[in-house]
Amino acid sequence: MVTYISDYKKLVERQIENEAEMRNRGGKRTETRENKAVEKERESMTTHGKKLLKASIDKFENTIQTFLNENNRGPKFVAKKYLDQLEPRLTAVIAAKKIIDSVTSVRKFTAQAISLGGKIEDELYFQAFSQSPENKALFESINKDLDKRSNHYEYRRWKLLLSSKRKGFEWDRWPVRDKLLVGELLISLFIEATGLVQVEKVFKRKRAYNVLTATKKTLEWIKNVKDFNKFFDPEFYPLICKPRRWKTSIGGGYISRHIEPMFLVTGNNITSHRTYIEELKNYDMPGVYNGLNTLQETPWVVNKHILNVAKTVFNDDSRNRGGLITSKLMELPNKPHNISDKSPEGLKALSKWKSQATIVYTQNQKLKSKRLAEANTIYIGNKFADEKQIYHVGRLCFRDRFYYVTGYFNPQGTDLAKAMHLFANKKPLGTVGEKYLCLQLANTYGEDKISLDDRIKWVHKNKDQIIASAKDPFNNSFWEHADKGFFKLKKKIKN
C-alpha cells in the first residue's frame, strides 16, 4: 500500500511537471505567432490587436460621423467627398484595422497615410465593380474561390483587380495627393477618438520627418496584455494519471494550477459565455458528468509499432508509406524568358506565371501545415510511448458533442493519431469481437459498400496479405491501398 501511494505521488508530480511544460510551450507558440503577425503587419489579428480594435470601433465611428456632418472646406473637404460614399462604420473598421495592423511599429506618417487612403479607394472600387448587374455574379464567384485559397489582402486585391480589368471595368484612379489627404484625415480622427497612437517628428541624417507610433500608455497596455495572455493557450498533452473529474461546469480535466480551470462547454471567454457556464452550475446533470468522466478516465497506451513505422516514413522520403506528407514541396513553374518585358506579351506571360505560381505556393503552404501536424502527432506519441497508461481530457461543444482537448494526438484525430492509440486494458475479442474486427478491417480498406457477410469473407480471403503487412509493412504494400492506411495497419497488427 505504501509503495502504491508513493508511486502514485511520483506520477502526480510528473504530471504537474508536464502541465508546466504544456503552459510554457503554449506561451512560446503564442509569442512566435504574434511576432510573425507583427512582422507581416497583421497585428489586428493578435490578442491585443483584437482588443484594441473592438474597443476603438464605436468611438472612431462616432468621430467620423461627427466630421461628415460638418460643413468642411479646404483640404479636408477633398477627403470628405470620398468618405461620404462609405458608411462610417465600414470606414472605421477599415481604417482602424489598418492602423492597428502595425501599431507597435514605427511607420513613416506619409507612407502610412497614402496606404490607408489606398485601402479606402480599394473598397469603393470593388463596391462599384460588384454592384453593376453584369459583374455581381462574377464578383461573388471570385470571392468564394478566394475564401478557399487565401485570406492575404494583397493577393485577394490583385485577383479582383485582374478580373475587373478583364471585364473592361473602368475607374478613375485617385491622385496620390487625394489618398494622402484621406489617410491623414482618418489618422487624425483615430487619434482624436482613441488616443492610441501619436504623430512624432524624428530626425535622421539631418532630415526631419513625421512618424506614426503607439503612445507610451498604449505600449505599456500591450505589454501587460501579452504577459497576461501568453500562458492562456497551453499546448495540451495527454495525462499520465487520471484527470480531475467533472463535478460542475468548471474545473474538470488537468490537475494543477499551471492550467487555467476549464469550462465544461467550449466557447469564447466572454461575459455571455461565462454567465452561461455559471448558470449550468444550478443544474443537476449526473448523466452528463458520468459520461464525460467515463470517457476521460479510459486508459490508453501508445501503439509503438505504428509509432515506429510513422517515424521511419516521416523521416525518410524514400520509404514513405501510408499517405504521410513528404518533405518535398511542389516546384514553382519556370519563369518565362520575357517576364521582364513590359510589352503586352510580356505582361501577359507575367500574369499567367503569377497565377500558376500562386496555386503552387498555396498548395505548398497546405502541405507544410499538414506535415507540421504530423510532426506534432509523432512528437507527442513518442513523448508518451513508454507510459503504462495515458488519459485524454474531454469537454463538450455547444451542441453537447464530446471532444478531446489534446491537440494532434488523440483518439478522435487523424488516421495516424487514431492508429497510434490502443486501449490499455486488454480483453479477449471473442466470436462477436472478431466479427466486428473483420468489419472494421474491411471498412478502413474501403470495402464498405458490400454486405456485412461479404466484408467478413473479404477479410478471410486476404488474411495472408493482412498478416504479412502487419509483420513487415515496408516490404508488403497491401495496407497502403486502404482508405485509412495507418488505421488499417493497426487493425492488421491487432488481428
Identify the role of each PLM range:
Residues 1-495:
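Non-catalytic nucleic-acid-binding interfaces of large nucleic-acid enzymes and RNP effectors
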